[in-house]
Regions:
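N-terminal pre-domain/capping segments
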Residues: 2-128, 143, 147-154, 161, ...
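Acidic/histidine-rich catalytic cores of soluble enzymes
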Residues: 18-20, 30, 144, 150-270, ...
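Active-site beta-loop-alpha junctions enriched in small/polar residues
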Residues: 23-27, 50-54, 96-99, 135-137, ...
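Conserved beta-strand positions in the central sheet of alpha/beta enzyme cores
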Residues: 48, 93-95, 131, 168, ...
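Active-site groove signature of glycoside hydrolases
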Residues: 122-142, 168-178
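Short glycine/proline-rich, acidic loop/turn segments that cap or connect secondary-structure elements
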Residues: 275-288
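Conserved small/polar residues in nucleotide/adenosyl-binding loops
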Residues: 289-295
């Protein structure tokens, strides 16, 4: 099966403390039902379901629509939930990762409008979790982006709160190539910025979709934040990063990251997964972990 052979497994469900799943955008060519069937047959218990608007993808792994939130109604939602239940697979979150702080006003509005639809769908499906990016204007500094995030996200969070939906922000900088230079397209990349975001946006419905791999190439500690932000970790990604130190010595850390690192599947990179899982359990995270795109 294209793109997903690395996820095939003979594991049987054993009621583990952490339910394992994956983000469905890795199976872009398959229907929602086919994805659920694959998950069930291979021992996965949950799915982070891709909910981009239909149309041409703006980047790899975007533009995947396994649930079309623009046409979702209560009948279709019930049908989806029944299909999942019959196969013992749950939906952990609806995934949509745009840039709602885009410098282009039209792009920003389209992203926000669709995000609102995803929030509605999460409530309709009783998933009550949306995974996304905080966004970033890549040509503004951090301070100006924080002010922009506060302005843009307050009404989004009010909307989510009224529907009982949590928003889990991933910490990927979205800075890989010259297209995202100089600042990347996601602001929420570090503990220092998280503190400021949570201060400016003090909502119990705003938290993190924690991916340790992005700390690796930024040369940051990915274990310590698990303690400090334990109450804000709503969702967790499983992805690894392998840093090529010879390449980094050649180009320097200010080069575009893909020139000295490689995203990869868990166990093939530099994340200490035993320690990571141990600390997640120690801090009380008894929920879901998801294999993310190897990019």
């Amino acid at each position: 099966m294209k793109n997903v052979n690395y996820m095939k497994t003979n594991r049987k469900r054993k009621g583990s403390l952490l339910k394992q799943g994956f983000i469905t955008s890795v199976m872009a060519d398959y229907s929602f039902e086919q994805v659920v069937d694959f998950a069930s047959e291979n021992g996965f218990e949950c799915l982070e379901v891709a909910c981009w608007p239909k149309g041409k993808a703006e980047r790899k792994y975007a533009g995947v629509t396994h649930i079309d939130v623009s046409t979702l109604d209560s009948f279709k939602a019930e049908e989806i939930l029944r299909y999942c239940k019959d196969r013992k697979v749950t939906i952990s979150a609806l995934a949509y990762y745009p840039n709602v702080l885009d410098e282009d006003d039209e792009c920003r509005k389209k992203s926000i409008d669709h995000l609102m639809q995803v929030i509605n769908a999460a409530a309709e499906l009783k998933v009550n979790m949306v995974t996304t990016f905080i966004g970033r204007n890549q040509n503004l500094n951090v301070s100006d982006n924080l002010a922009l995030a506060e302005k843009i996200w307050k009404p989004i969070l009010n909307y989510a709160e009224n529907r009982g939906v949590k928003i889990a922000i991933e910490n990927c900088p979205m800075l890989f190539t010259e297209d995202e230079w100089p600042g990347g397209k996601n602001l929420a990349i570090s503990p220092a910025i998280w503190r400021e975001l949570f201060k400016r946006l003090p909502s119990d419905m705003l938290g993190l979709n924690f991916d340790p791999s992005h700390f690796i190439w930024q040369e940051m500690d990915y274990i310590k934040p698990l303690y400090e932000f334990k109450d804000k970790i709503f969702h967790v990604h499983y992805k690894d990063i392998k840093v090529n130190k010879d390449a980094r010595n050649d180009v320097g850390i200010l080069a575009t990251p893909l020139s000295y690192m490689l995203p990869c599947i868990p166990g093939h990179g530099d994340v200490d997964w035993s320690e990571y899982i141990r600390v997640l359990l120690e801090t009380g995270y008894l929920s879901l972990i998801h294999i993310s795109e190897p990019t």
